[in-house]
């Protein structure tokens, strides 16, 4: 199934595979909806090591993140829909773009990550 999903350019959300061709929602609308629905969202290409580091850091501080793994053509469509020259992986906290791994590390090292996560209700504890 994964090989079929990758070949068809589908997007994986957790264990759910979403076929963008079968949806009426445009990529920009889908990105906006996903960012609004979850306090912490990571958009990444499947297997991206930087996204893995981001997930580990967020989990280490007690945050629950929604991770949207993109494959094939879906990755390019969603990346373009992020706008502003955003590249994958891309992190959003409370609907605001943080950036990639460097942005996340900057927040963490400055001591602003946990307070921001607490502010948006993303901490498990």
Swiss-Prot record:
One of its GO terms (molecular function) is metal ion binding. [2Fe-2S] cluster binds at residue 48. Residues 28-124 form the Glutaredoxin domain. It is found in: Cytoplasm. Its main location: cytoplasm. InterPro entries: GlrX-like_pln_2 (IPR011905), Thioredoxin-like_sf (IPR036249). GO terms for cellular component: cytoplasm. Keywords: 2Fe-2S, Cytoplasm, Iron, Iron-sulfur, Metal-binding, Redox-active center. It comes from the Eukaryota. Belongs to the glutaredoxin family. CC-type subfamily. May only reduce GSH-thiol disulfides, but not protein disulfides. This is Monothiol glutaredoxin-S2.
